[in-house]
Amino acid sequence: MKQFLITGGTGMVGSQLVNKLKNRDVHITILTRSDKQSDDPKISYVNWSKDGWMSQVPDIDVVVNLAGATLNKRWTPSYKQLIMTSRIQSTQSLVDLFSQREHKPEVLFNASAMGYYPPSLYHTYTEKYQTHPFDFLSDVVYQWERFAKRFESFGTRVVLGRFSMILSNDGGALQTMKLPYKFFVGGKLGSGFQWYSWIHINDLVRAILFTIDNPNAKGPFNMAAPIAERQNLFGYTLARVMHRPHETWVPSFLMRLALGEMSTVVLDTQKVLPNKLDALGFTFNYSNLKIAFEDLIDA
């Protein structure tokens, strides 16, 4: 029986991953910030905000690090600090845990983000592209990956999953995007020409497990469907599935005024391709945006 250790295991991605893992011969230890009890013999909770938490963690074979404050809040100076520290400190805590253990994990899957890549209307990014921090979000990603790579000193295989926009019924971007269309005011955001790289939650969880299971999976992986869409077409497709108009236009300056620096997530975007997943033979169940929306939205 393999032992999994998961941070962020009660979040949008983590909860889906845990549900999938229940079908395997594994035991799952979930690190949380509160006291929780499990009725499932396959799942244990450890409150890692308490002293002595490390002694409650068994020997671990696979680590999945998803912990980090959400980006879907206004980026005040104090919240920007939380976005950074919540990722760095949790990852360093994991490094500290295993530096004291003789039994090292075989693999670490560490969440990351496509914010690693510079925004571009015309460039297509694969995992081969290398850069240095150029804004706040890219610095968060850069530092998070840098800390995760410390696991390599243990002989652990490290996978860096650069998440694109996650489409899910349980939270995330889709729930926010649906709101204006629900009230018949959805439409183009900014130029509408910016790219939206995306992935269905089902495919994301499958891709995470695929990279964990595949011994040839190492380094950065773009967790994105193979076909990105411009925002205007993305919104139009959502409108069609919801049977709503796609007619409103919100100029970029209003988006930046309303959202502040967080508007970069909506306006300053990237087109990324999952080349390494493709090369290893991963197949997407949802590579078509309309089909993905139809699966997630009750028309």
Swiss-Prot record:
Record Gene3D superfamilies: NAD(P)-binding Rossmann-like Domain
Superkingdom classification of source: Bacteria
InterPro entries: DUF1731, Epimerase_deHydtase, NAD(P)-bd_dom_sf, SDR39U1
Alphabetized Pfam families for the sequence: DUF1731 (PF08338), Epimerase (PF01370)
Family: Belongs to the NAD(P)-dependent epimerase/dehydratase family. SDR39U1 subfamily.
Protein name according to UniProt: Epimerase family protein SH2119
Organism: Staphylococcus haemolyticus (strain JCSC1435)
Source organism phylogeny: Bacteria, Bacillati, Bacillota, Bacilli, Bacillales
